Amino acid sequence: MNDPRKTESTTHFGYQSVPESQKARKVAEVFHSVAAKYDLMNDVLSGGLHRLWKRFTIELSGVRRGNRVLDIAGGTGDLTLQFSRLVGESGEVLLADINDSMLKVGRDRLLDRGVAGNVRFVQADAEKLPFPDNHFDVITIAFGLRNVTRKEDALRSMLRVLKPGGRLLVLEFSKPSNALLGKVYDAYSFAFMPLAGKLITNDADSYRYLAESIRMHPDQETLKSMMAGAGFERVTYHNMTGGIVALHRGLKP
């Protein structure tokens, strides 16, 4: 009988090659570590630009009153907060995250902001979403897809739970379109990000993983092809901040 440890598929965890069964646990450890300071670090590392990137995502989503929205890897709830206001009492927003530490921070933050009634919190794996077919008008995943082990499975799962005509928006770090910007961004990522992580969260390794995971994530055209391959139509993307971040959008037929 073959030893399954010798045949198990591997994937990347940053620049490391690890068995697929271990990646989810390693990613979970990262986000358990950074959850409490996640919002602060977003502001520090992006200079506040993440708020503009998310605002554009909300604008392009076309969410309106009465919609049902799924915010995957919703974390501390930035998108969910805005979506809850847009869908109103007749709509619903589900904040889903596989990491219970991030989910707790998001739940506490939104409750402190008075968000209730039209928001639910669900611990869920993007690769196996626990929702009915044809259920959501809009799905977003912001800065989460690169941490998913089997991205194609996750995209197919998202397609399944979207209503026909529904929209998926993937906001993610990507590849700078200018070579000089890319060099500056690399220097920033591998020097400043781990240092800031050490000073603010006492965890340089998690932010070193962040920098590495960005480099291992598919570039704009590859992700566009992956979304089309999963069954999405009219897939487009918008580069922001010189391609450091890209917003992909696709429709379910």
UniProtKB/Swiss-Prot annotation:
Q: What is its EC number?
A: 2.1.1.163, 2.1.1.201
Q: Which of UniProt's keywords are assigned here? A: Menaquinone biosynthesis, Methyltransferase, S-adenosyl-L-methionine, Transferase, Ubiquinone biosynthesis
- The residues that hold S-adenosyl-L-methionine are 76, 97, 125-126
Alphabetically, the GO molecular function entries are: 2-methoxy-6-polyprenyl-1,4-benzoquinol methyltransferase activity; demethylmenaquinone methyltransferase activity
The protein's annotated pathway:
Quinol/quinone metabolism; menaquinone biosynthesis; menaquinol from 1,4-dihydroxy-2-naphthoate: step 2/2; Cofactor biosynthesis; ubiquinone biosynthesis
State any GO BP term from the record: methylation
The first-level EC class reads transferase
Q: Which domain of life is it from?
A: Bacteria
* Catalysis performed (reactions): a 2-demethylmenaquinol + S-adenosyl-L-methionine = a menaquinol + S-adenosyl-L-homocysteine + H(+); a 2-methoxy-6-(all-trans-polyprenyl)benzene-1,4-diol + S-adenosyl-L-methionine = a 5-methoxy-2-methyl-3-(all-trans-polyprenyl)benzene-1,4-diol + S-adenosyl-L-homocysteine + H(+)
In terms of InterPro entries, this protein maps to:
SAM-dependent_MTases_sf, UbiE/COQ5_MeTrFase, UbiE/COQ5_MeTrFase_CS
NCBIfam families recorded = MenG_MenH_UbiE, PRK00216.1-1, PRK00216.1-5
The UniProt function text for this chain reads:
Methyltransferase required for the conversion of demethylmenaquinol (DMKH2) to menaquinol (MKH2) and the conversion of 2-polyprenyl-6-methoxy-1,4-benzoquinol (DDMQH2) to 2-polyprenyl-3-methyl-6-methoxy-1,4-benzoquinol (DMQH2).
Q: List, alphabetically, the HAMAP family matched.
A: MenG_UbiE_methyltr
Q: Family assignment?
A: Belongs to the class I-like SAM-binding methyltransferase superfamily. MenG/UbiE family.
Q: What is this protein called?
A: Ubiquinone/menaquinone biosynthesis C-methyltransferase UbiE
Species of origin reads Azotobacter vinelandii (strain DJ / ATCC BAA-1303)
Task: Name the gene behind this protein.
Answer: ubiE
